[in-house]
Regions:
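Rhodanese-like catalytic fold shared by cysteine-dependent sulfurtransferases
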Residues: 2-8, 18-45, 50, 69-96, ...
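Structural scaffold elements adjacent to functional motifs in cytosolic proteins
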Residues: 59-61
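Short, glycine/acidic-enriched loop or turn micro-motifs at the edges of active sites
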Residues: 64
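Short, surface-exposed ligand- or partner-binding patches at beta-edge/loop junctions that are enriched
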Residues: 99-101
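A general structural motif
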Residues: 55-57, 94
Length: 144
């Protein structure tokens, strides 16, 4: 009988806690080896064409500030991934967004977060691929 009471108590406690976990989808920590499913990648060549054509877009580096200050794609502003929800609230929903990070997992996740927030044009471009194609980077300078 005691075993049954303990089992039912544990079951009830699990049900009581479950809704609080279900309300917030996990975003962090991000698996640094996987891209977000469904995020659209922009090639470095496509990004260069956007820059050369004077296309209106916002390039957002989602790396931590220390990494951004060491190296980023020219013209990027810094909104670290951990602050992306708040940062997106300050940007008009019709803005074309291109996210960047070192290898892609953070920026692809940011693109999906922006899409879920109502932005319709979101892509990402890894900084490593940008550099592999011979493009220059710069130190981020307090742009956020």
């Amino acid at each position: 009988m005691k075993l049954l009471i303990v089992a039912l108590s544990l079951f009830a406690a699990t049900l009581w806690c479950a809704p609080s976990f279900a309300q917030q989808p996990p975003r962090f920590p991000i698996d640094q080896n996987k891209l977000a499913v469904g995020a659209k990648e922009k090639t470095p060549e496509e990004l260069k064409q956007m820059m050369a054509n004077g296309s209106k877009f916002m390039l957002i580096d989602v790396n931590p500030r220390a990494q951004f200050e060491k190296e980023t794609i020219p013209g990027a502003v810094n909104i670290p991934l951990e602050e992306i929800d708040e940062g997106l609230k300050k940007i008009p929903k019709d803005t074309v967004l291109v996210f960047a990070c070192n290898r892609g997992p953070r920026s692809s996740q940011a693109a999906k977060i922006a899409e879920a927030a109502g932005f319709t044009s979101t892509t990402f471009c890894p900084i490593m691929k940008w550099k592999e194609e011979g493009n220059k980077t710069e130190a981020g300078k307090g742009k956020s």
